[in-house]
Amino acid sequence: MRLLRVAAALGRGPFPRVPAVLGWQGKQADWKTRRWCSSGPVPNEKIRNIGISAHIDSGKTTLTERVLYYTGRIATMHEVKGKDGVGAVMDSMELERQRGITIQSAATYTMWKDININIIDTPGHVDFTIEVERALRVLDGAVLVLCAVGGVQCQTMTVSRQMKRYNVPFLTFINKLDRMGSNPSRALQQMRSKLNHNAAFVQIPIGLEGDFKGIIDLIEERAIYFDGDFGQIVRYDEIPAGLRAAAADHRQELIECVANSDEQLGELFLEEKIPSVSDLKRAIRRATLSRSFTPVFLGSALKNKGVQPLLDAVLEYLPNPSEVQNYAILNQNDSKEKTKILMNPQRDDSHPFVGLAFKLEAGRFGQLTYVRNYQGELKKGSTIYNTRTGKKVRVQRLVRMHADMMEDVEEVYAGDICALFGIDCASGDTFTNKDNSDLSMESIHVPEPVISIAMRPSNKNDLEKFSKGIGRFTREDPTFKVHFDPESKETIVSGMGELHLEIYAQRMEREYGCPCITGKPKVAFRETIVAPVPFDFTHKKQSGGAGQFGKVIGVLEPLPPEDYTKLEFSDETFGSNVPKQFVPAVEKGFLDACEKGPLSGHKLSGLRFVLQDGAHHMVDSNEISFIRAGEGALKQALANGTLCIIEPIMSVEVIAPNEFQGTVFAGINRRHGVITGQDGIEDYFTLYADVPLNNMFGYSTELRSCTEGKGEYTMEYCRYQPCSPSTQEELINKYLEATGQLPVKKGKAKN
């Protein structure tokens, strides 16, 4: 009766009778006996670890809600944005239910046709990209959700790149076929042209928009309808007469696409043999696992159509943990070379435990650490070691998560995703059960923040709550960074976008009772040089007794545009003019001096400091002497060189009705955007442009007003490039006024 207790806790009453065709046969109490930790370890073949990723508002959370309902995990379906006063199960944070967007990756597990499925529902908003990175790093397969109207959008391309980085096989689900203007064929064409995927339909729709009735399975050659109040009764029928020719054409196209990427099916195709259903399914599985083919499924999660066949496809075509190769890196102190060790996916204790902490969360249950187990067994009460810190910790409680609810388990094995309590660690740490292990899993790619704001508590008495909240948020999210500005005496928080930082300000008030005042957003401008500059600097200080002496000679070089965010140091000295023990001190001086540029006070970046020669004194030279010499050399080079200010450029995608095309183009041009492309379907157009982030503030309000609320846009960080002369002059004058080197113009409003 565990499930009834869970349902009661959710306030949703007992479960309805779910038909056997859904794959969850038997009585309600059967769930308890078929849980994850039933009797002994579940074999790898009966496990799938999947993520659901997509562009914002493509219907990821709605799809997950339907999956949980059809698999018997929840009793009642609820909608995103809490239209029914409840909100989706996977949106457990109050802010998520209010806004109707997913902010954190919610983890859950369920069961379909005797197969255990771990599901991570990820955010679609580009400001929360780190959550998607974390999810894909630890998953074996994924479902990429596309909107049938929007097709391949800005964040879809980002997610596709992330899947490629972590080599994640995936299926595609084109959602929202019931929406006006839905065009799955266009979405498929965009997958081929924009994402370079070898993709083909595995299903085609029976009707579109308001006439969407069901789907045709091209492999089994049959029509599928979804009857009942909630689409829970799956009914199979013959293909409608009017669609038989189209189904035959699409089936032939599917076979050709798969044959191009699978050798075995390719041979059958060349021999002009007709592949059987099982031949085709096996070929699709092989091609999907090798990422050479993407099967495309169709449906409407909101209208309860197409979800059960997608679940069948997850079992049929996505890999189990034993079919994915995961490597750990052996860090050897005496060698710069890193040895890769293949993890063993056997679900027993015959190999040492290795796990990766991929997400931290502090909620009402205390500190939670999400861990993916890559090898061996982890038991409740056992001792594990953090390979980064060398500290040992005891596993006091081991749980599986279902959104913000949890279920205690005694042990987990390779391939499982679980959560631990009371573990002190950082995101990306590796755990083993051997204290001398130097293993570490490959770290998760963390993008650099692009926007900063000043944040302080409204009430000075809330400083303790404020610091506690900031500490928790920085541990949870590596893209949320905090520093104290000694000049303005303000706490500056940095993140991936306005929404990202706004969410944290609201969480501070809701979760810690600490309302915050935020300043105007500040763009992460940087300063760099445009040409190499030589330097020859001597630092001397003599004030009685031992003095200071350090001389450095070399050149300061600009880095190529793709490395504008980096700082590099190169030691090209020969002999002992600059003793090797003082070279790190020169580097430290260079890096310290890069914290503030001479033009506008922003950080310096895109520089390479090449140390070629120098001199030292037997008595007076020490570490501090060469730190000062490194600082002085940089300042000397900057004084003699030509500097410029660089700014972040965003890739912007605007979608609006055709009647507002001229207005939208004019708005982007006014913000100094460079239009890179254009697309259109029916009454809507899509505009692609590169626009400076500094010019994008307030654009959402402008777009809403000039398109009567019908336009929408997304943007993501693209690159750094030199800003316009007018922007550079404005930033320099603002800095000179702030430092008192230039009188403030009369009548100018102070910020």
From Swiss-Prot:
<keyword id="KW-0547">Nucleotide-binding</keyword>
<dbReference type="InterPro" id="IPR009000">
    <property type="entry name" value="Transl_B-barrel_sf"/>
</dbReference>
<feature type="modified residue" description="N6-acetyllysine">
    <location>
        <position position="176"/>
    </location>
</feature>
<dbReference type="Pfam" id="PF03144">
    <property type="entry name" value="GTP_EFTU_D2"/>
</dbReference>
<dbReference type="InterPro" id="IPR020568">
    <property type="entry name" value="Ribosomal_Su5_D2-typ_SF"/>
</dbReference>
<keyword id="KW-0597">Phosphoprotein</keyword>
<feature type="transit peptide" description="Mitochondrion">
    <location>
        <begin position="1"/>
        <end position="37"/>
    </location>
</feature>
<dbReference type="InterPro" id="IPR014721">
    <property type="entry name" value="Ribsml_uS5_D2-typ_fold_subgr"/>
</dbReference>
<keyword id="KW-0342">GTP-binding</keyword>
<dbReference type="Pfam" id="PF14492">
    <property type="entry name" value="EFG_III"/>
</dbReference>
<dbReference type="InterPro" id="IPR004540">
    <property type="entry name" value="Transl_elong_EFG/EF2"/>
</dbReference>
<feature type="modified residue" description="Phosphoserine">
    <location>
        <position position="92"/>
    </location>
</feature>
<keyword id="KW-0809">Transit peptide</keyword>
<feature type="binding site">
    <location>
        <begin position="54"/>
        <end position="61"/>
    </location>
    <ligand>
        <name>GTP</name>
    </ligand>
</feature>
<dbReference type="InterPro" id="IPR009022">
    <property type="entry name" value="EFG_III"/>
</dbReference>
<comment type="pathway">
    <text>Protein biosynthesis; polypeptide chain elongation.</text>
</comment>
<dbReference type="InterPro" id="IPR035647">
    <property type="entry name" value="EFG_III/V"/>
</dbReference>
<dbReference type="InterPro" id="IPR000795">
    <property type="entry name" value="T_Tr_GTP-bd_dom"/>
</dbReference>
<dbReference type="GO" id="GO:0005739">
    <property type="term" value="C:mitochondrion"/>
</dbReference>
<keyword id="KW-0496">Mitochondrion</keyword>
<dbReference type="Pfam" id="PF00009">
    <property type="entry name" value="GTP_EFTU"/>
</dbReference>
<dbReference type="InterPro" id="IPR000640">
    <property type="entry name" value="EFG_V-like"/>
</dbReference>
<feature type="binding site">
    <location>
        <begin position="175"/>
        <end position="178"/>
    </location>
    <ligand>
        <name>GTP</name>
    </ligand>
</feature>
<keyword id="KW-0251">Elongation factor</keyword>
<dbReference type="InterPro" id="IPR004161">
    <property type="entry name" value="EFTu-like_2"/>
</dbReference>
<dbReference type="GO" id="GO:0070125">
    <property type="term" value="P:mitochondrial translational elongation"/>
</dbReference>
<keyword id="KW-0007">Acetylation</keyword>
<dbReference type="InterPro" id="IPR041095">
    <property type="entry name" value="EFG_II"/>
</dbReference>
<dbReference type="InterPro" id="IPR047872">
    <property type="entry name" value="EFG_IV"/>
</dbReference>
<dbReference type="InterPro" id="IPR027417">
    <property type="entry name" value="P-loop_NTPase"/>
</dbReference>
<feature type="domain" description="tr-type G">
    <location>
        <begin position="45"/>
        <end position="322"/>
    </location>
</feature>
<dbReference type="GO" id="GO:0005525">
    <property type="term" value="F:GTP binding"/>
</dbReference>
<dbReference type="InterPro" id="IPR005225">
    <property type="entry name" value="Small_GTP-bd"/>
</dbReference>
<protein>
    <recommendedName>
        <fullName>Elongation factor G, mitochondrial</fullName>
        <ecNumber>3.6.5.-</ecNumber>
    </recommendedName>
</protein>
<dbReference type="GO" id="GO:0003746">
    <property type="term" value="F:translation elongation factor activity"/>
</dbReference>
<dbReference type="InterPro" id="IPR035649">
    <property type="entry name" value="EFG_V"/>
</dbReference>
<comment type="function">
    <text>Mitochondrial GTPase that catalyzes the GTP-dependent ribosomal translocation step during translation elongation. During this step, the ribosome changes from the pre-translocational (PRE) to the post-translocational (POST) state as the newly formed A-site-bound peptidyl-tRNA and P-site-bound deacylated tRNA move to the P and E sites, respectively. Catalyzes the coordinated movement of the two tRNA molecules, the mRNA and conformational changes in the ribosome. Does not mediate the disassembly of ribosomes from messenger RNA at the termination of mitochondrial protein biosynthesis.</text>
</comment>
<comment type="similarity">
    <text>Belongs to the TRAFAC class translation factor GTPase superfamily. Classic translation factor GTPase family. EF-G/EF-2 subfamily.</text>
</comment>
<keyword id="KW-0378">Hydrolase</keyword>
<dbReference type="GO" id="GO:0003924">
    <property type="term" value="F:GTPase activity"/>
</dbReference>
<keyword id="KW-0648">Protein biosynthesis</keyword>
<dbReference type="Pfam" id="PF00679">
    <property type="entry name" value="EFG_C"/>
</dbReference>
